[in-house]
């Protein structure tokens, strides 16, 4: 669905509706995803305004959900995008990701499930496949290492404790937190999620490297299996 009958050239928009002018007047945080993307794209096509082009691009990738993981080839194959616009989009996404990692800090202290979710949310909430990640912590609960252990549907027979604890020993970790995403955006834990959690928790108790929590990441939402009583 076209968002509405818009003029084809951005210069023909009413001054108060132009995305760049709105950003300067109100601030970037008050612009929609559509407007921010239109600023990146800069121009539309002969038959479509830049606002409609941005809207169509977001619709193609289910909003921002899949846009982060799109390749240059996938983006440039969309009519009206092309190589230059695809590169601009990917550069902006990567820059945002790097800024987030810098602000999070290399040795982020995790004191709560909210801290853990915040540390991984922007990296994980748009992934199109399940990623099982371990955050290894020192005695001060600082993240000393982050490792993707497995990619694919979570299964207790696939996520082997050996792989998880081998890295823990290598990093001299005092404890760890497991994190995995649900590509659907719904962080409700599955039976397999719970089984994997309990298995790793029991192994951690035997070895002396405590599993502090298992976080399931959705789209701007998360569930702590510790808070749910599974640890």
Swiss-Prot record:
Binding positions for Zn(2+) per the UniProt entry: 180, 182, 193
Pfam family, one: RadC
Family annotation (InterPro entries): MPN, RadC_JAB, RuvA_2-like, UPF0758, UPF0758_CS, UPF0758_N
MPN domain mapped to chain residues: 109-231
Hydrolase in keyword set: yes
Motif JAMM motif: where in chain: 180-193
GO molecular function: metal ion binding; metallopeptidase activity
UniProt superkingdom: Bacteria
Alphabetical keyword list: Hydrolase, Metal-binding, Metalloprotease, Protease, Zinc
Family, per entry: Belongs to the UPF0758 family.
PANTHER family found in the cross-reference section: DNA REPAIR PROTEIN RADC, UPF0758 PROTEIN YEES-RELATED
Record-given protein name: UPF0758 protein RBAM_025090
